[in-house]
Curated annotation (Swiss-Prot):
Organism expressing this protein natively: Clavibacter sepedonicus (Clavibacter michiganensis subsp. sepedonicus)
Keywords (A to Z) from UniProt: Cytoplasm, GTP-binding, Initiation factor, Nucleotide-binding, Protein biosynthesis
Name recorded for this polypeptide: Translation initiation factor IF-2
Ranges annotated as biased composition (Pro residues): 82-92, 223-236
Residue ranges, compositional bias (Basic and acidic residues): 123-135
Source taxon at top rank: Bacteria
Length: 944
């Protein structure tokens, strides 16, 4: 829909364009001229403002009054001099009036409307006054007018008195004062020469109509009532001797006669008695267009050159127009584009790494418009670029939407529902008769070096800690042991999570798959920060806790202190009246290990319903995964429900394939794995992530499609996470100052959990904003030649965690100069990379005062300016050093330099304390006796 213009709105309201422009200026809207277009909301405000100001319709009031015909039976006021005749009171019955002879009785008439006619023709005041005086003189010499009596139905004259057609021929009548000759009035706007040209042949006339269209409901024009006027040269006037004046219809105003250059006679009201002949064309050479008199009622407009003409019709707005206006009102403009807005409570759910196109589909908007809006908000992005949650929050707040980013769990659940897989619904549909008891899954948690792995080693009667570098568990291990309970053996599955803070995410996943948590606390150290962190993870997962107080055989151990400290965190021992079992153990001597297993089984039987359905496809979690040189991708999985068999098609995260072989923690082959059983699976296409869910599908194709969709989702999430938000100001500054420095890393590790934990730890390193840490690639396995090629292109450093490069990769790295660093303990990797980032920072400088000199005398020289005679109070004054002048503690001159330094007549490089000298500060001459000259130097500030 086209936008309205100012002059159109002014014409619709009935005011001139200047008034509308002035009102717009008051409203604060910048509009150039009457032809400028404005927005529909601004148009509505303009109309409301004009209506409130009381100026609406003032310009259109005279025209409306003239166009409205008098109602039947309405009383009219006394005729005014110079006005048109108005109908008098309408009696119910009136006798017929005989037509008087023209020679005896003059025809009753009212004064001419000379003033109105001259005003409409825009004549000068002088000509109007002269004609008005002549009209009054003629009216005074005429016979007093008799009241005209009208009947409801005026009789038609006899057939012999048919009037001549109103074709513009002058008619004789009562003598009237001689009007000025047309064409001789230099002040008149109409210079017609009396005789009208043929209608339609005047190329300069504003009215090109070939005749006036009869009024609606009338068969012809009404006969004009006789009016006084001077005889015009030409044919005799009809209605003369022997012809009576045809009275007007009931309640109708008699139509006026046409006149040169003036307004033509008024058209009869619809429904008036019709008369024979043709309607008179518009009078005058350049008369006002339209033959409908002053008022342009229905049918009053002049016909156009090729058919129906007339004035501008005012039709009602269609539903489509109103709907378009409503949509424009509901979609305001932002940044020059129209976008739909929310009410502030509209929730829009987006997946991780969503793009502007995804957001546009949710709110039914154009992606290009949203890109423009985001650009005006200071963010630059393309329509298909993955954005982070913070950027969507900014955009949603501006548009009135609440952005809700779907969690990874919900996103994966929705993805599986697309393949008709609903894991939660499967568990709800299972009956109690198909559920069987499964072993409990226990997670060992605690602080670093509190003996978690040593305790698990004592339980398994095997030494697994010797294979860990530095005695620190680097990846998750899952084992199943058998313990005697009430006369028979029962299985317990243990998951050993690393205690270092870098593996927080891995420990969190361990708490999500566990049934019972064993919190290991050293009796000599007591509660430590990671002990509280592990406790919070277990409580957040709503997991029962069994506390193992380790190292009770060590000197200085105080198990009672541990019980007292844990009481502050809501863990109250049974001996203190609580419900948490505390067991004193010694992993070194094996004391209390059997009591600990007994406590685990009692806790499982008391408060947990450990049952699952083994007779269905397997579902579970990948505990850890690694890339074996001879066996390929190997994943340690924990079956939560169902049975996993060799040959099943499985998908775990972004990896898929068929189970080629399964082995337990001892390396023995397993053909079937039941619930709560940890096994190593071979046959996956890639290495899944630690904590990824796995499931068995009916076909390989389904597993591959699920893996590909998960990979795309994860890729978008990584792109959104790695995206650097940059504003317009930062972008301009970056263009001026150059590229921001960054340290690119490639991380390769032996297991996926360690790689992920190392990546998260590196991203937490806090350095200055001028240096960025970018991890461009991560993977599991040895460093390959492709990794070296990628590092060559991006100037990256390769970090190897418990892996080594192959010979080709080592040779290419030496040839290309790629830095490859290998670590077996995570502490060393974090420290060295943090040092590298700190070394890339730009040096920081600070001001150091080097000397202060007091001005004792000022020597003025026409060649060198003012020279300060000083004495050095402290430090050393050095030539070319930066200086500032201080007067009464206020700096009066800054960014100066010691351009000349002399002792007596010799130039010197420095002057020490308590020596006098002469100092020249170049063009700076605002120095006085008593001022101080302070010299400073910039020294590099060491980083902490």
């Amino acid at each position: 829909m086209a936008k309205p213009r100012v002059h159109e709105i002014a014409a619709e309201i009935g005011v001139d364009s200047k008034t509308a422009l002035a009102k717009l200026k008051e409203m604060g809207e910048f509009v150039k001229g009457p032809s400028s277009s404005i927005e529909p909301p601004v148009a509505r405000k303009l109309k409301a403002a004009l209506e409130a100001a009381g100026v609406t319709g003032q310009a259109a009031a005279p025209a409306a009054a003239a166009s409205s015909a008098p109602r039947p039976g309405a009383r009219s006021s006394a005729p005014k001099p110079g006005g048109r005749p108005t109908p008098g009171p309408q009696p119910t019955a009136a006798p017929e009036v005989e037509a008087p002879e023209a020679s005896d009785v003059p025809v009753p008439a009212k004064p001419l409307t000379v003033a109105e006619r001259q005003a409409q023709a825009e004549a000068s005041r002088k000509a109007a006054a002269e004609e008005k005086a002549q009209a009054e003189k003629s009216a005074a010499s005429a016979t007093p007018e008799a009241p005209a009596v009208e009947t409801p139905s005026a009789p038609r004259p006899d057939a012999g008195s048919t009037p001549a057609p109103s074709n513009g021929i002058p008619r004789p009548g009562i003598p009237r004062p001689a009007a000025p000759r047309p064409g001789n009035n230099p002040f008149a706007s109409n210079q017609g020469m009396g005789t009208k040209p043929r209608p339609g042949n005047n190329p300069f006339a504003s009215n090109q109509g070939m005749g006036q269209r009869p009024a609606a409901g009338a068969a012809g024009p009404r006969p004009a009532a006789p009016r006084p006027g001077s005889p015009r040269p030409g044919a005799p006037r009809p209605g003369g001797v022997g012809q009576g004046a045809r009275p007007a219809g009931f309640g109708q105003r008699p139509a006026g006669a046409g006149r040169p250059g003036g307004a033509p006679g008024g058209a009869g009201r619809p429904g008036a008695p019709a008369a024979g002949g043709f309607q008179r064309p518009a009078g005058g050479f350049a008369g006002r267009p339209g033959g409908g008199g002053r008022g342009r009622g229905p049918g009053g407009g002049t016909a156009g050159a090729f058919g129906r003409g007339g004035g501008k019709s005012k039709s009602r707005k269609s539903k489509r127009t109103k709907r378009a206006e409503f949509e424009l009102r509901e979609a305001p403009s932002l940044g020059g584009v129209s976008v739909p807005r929310g009410d502030g409570n509209t929730v829009v759910r987006l997946r991780r790494g969503a793009s502007i196109s995804d957001f546009a589909d949710k709110i039914d908007a154009s992606p290009g418009n949203l890109v423009t809006v985001l650009f005006h908000l200071g963010e630059m992005a393309t329509a298909t670029e993955s954005l982070d949650e913070a950027t969507f929050e900014v955009l949603g707040t501006e548009l009135g939407y609440k952005i809700q980013v779907v969690s990874p769990e919900d996103e994966d659940r929705e993805l599986l529902e697309g393949f008709d897989i609903d894991l939660d619904q499967e568990l709800e549909d299972e009956d109690d008769d198909v559920l069987e008891i499964r072993p409990p899954v226990v997670t060992v948690m605690g602080h670093v070096d509190h003996g978690k792995t040593r305790l698990l080693d004592a339980i398994r009667n095997a030494n697994v800690i010797e294979g860990e570098a530095g005695g620190i568990t680097q990846h998750i291990g899952a084992y199943q042991v058998w313990a005697p309970h009430e006369g028979y053996e029962r299985a317990i599955t243990f998951i050993d999570t690393p205690g270092h803070e870098a593996f927080t995410a891995m420990r969190t996943r361990g708490a999500q798959v566990t049934d019972i948590a064993i919190l290991v606390v050293a009796a000599d150290d007591g509660i430590m920060p990671q002990t509280v962190e592990a406790l919070n993870h277990a409580q957040a997962a709503n997991v029962p806790i069994v506390v193992a107080v380790n190292k009770v055989d060590k000197e200085g151990a105080n198990p009672a202190k541990v019980r007292q400290q844990l009481t502050e965190y809501g863990l109250v021992a049974e001996e203190y009246g609580g419900d948490v079992m505390f067991v004193d153990v010694s992993a070194l001597t094996g004391k209390g290990v059997e009591d600990l297993l007994e406590a685990v089984l009692l806790t499982a039987d008391a408060g947990l319903d450990l049952r699952s359905n083994p007779n269905k496809d397997a579902r579970g979690v990948a505990i850890e995964a690694r890339l074996d040189k001879g066996r390929g991708a190997v994943a340690t999985v924990l079956i939560q429900s169902g049975t996993l068999r060799v040959g099943d098609a499985i998908v775990a995260g972004t990896a898929y394939g068929r189970v080629r072989a399964m082995m337990d923690e001892n390396g023995d082959a397993v053909h079937e794995a039941y619930p709560s059983r940890p096994v190593q699976v071979q046959g996956l296409s890639s290495v899944p992530g630690a904590g990824d869910t796995f499931l068995v599908t009916e076909e390989d194709r389904t597993a591959r499609q699920i893996a590909e969709k998960r990979e795309a989702v994860e890729r978008n999430a990584q792109l959104a996470k790695a995206r650097k938000r940059i504003s317009l100001e930062d972008f301009t500054r970056a263009l001026e100052e150059g590229k921001v420095e960054s340290l690119n890393l490639i991380i390769k590790g032996d297991v996926s959990g360690a790689v992920e934990a190392l990546e998260e730890s590196l991203m937490k390193i806090e350095v200055d904003d001028s240096v960025q840490l970018r991890i461009i690639h991560r993977g599991v396995g040895a460093v390959t030649e492709s990794d070296v090629n990628l590092a060559t292109i991006d100037n990256a450093i390769i970090i190897g965690f418990n892996v080594r490069p192959d010979p080709k990769a080592r040779a290419r790295a030496a040839r290309e100069g790629v830095d490859i660093r290998f670590y077996s303990v995570i502490y060393s990797a974090l420290e060295e990379i943090e040092s590298s980032l700190t070394g890339m920072l730009k040096p920081e400088f600070e001001e150091v005062q080097s000397g202060v000199a007091e001005i004792r005398e000022v020597f003025r020289s026409s060649k060198f300016g003012n020279i300060a005679g000083v004495i050095v109070r402290s430090g050393t004054i050095t030539r070319n050093a930066k200086a500032r002048v201080i007067r009464d503690g206020v700096v009066v001159g800054d960014s100066l330099a010691i351009e000349s330094l002399r002792r007596f007549k010799d130039d010197v490089s420095e002057v020490r304390t308590d020596f006098e000298a002469g100092i020249g500060l170049g063009k700076f001459n605002d120095i006085q006796i008593g001022d101080e000259i302070e010299t400073i130097e910039m020294k590099e500030k060491p980083r902490g």
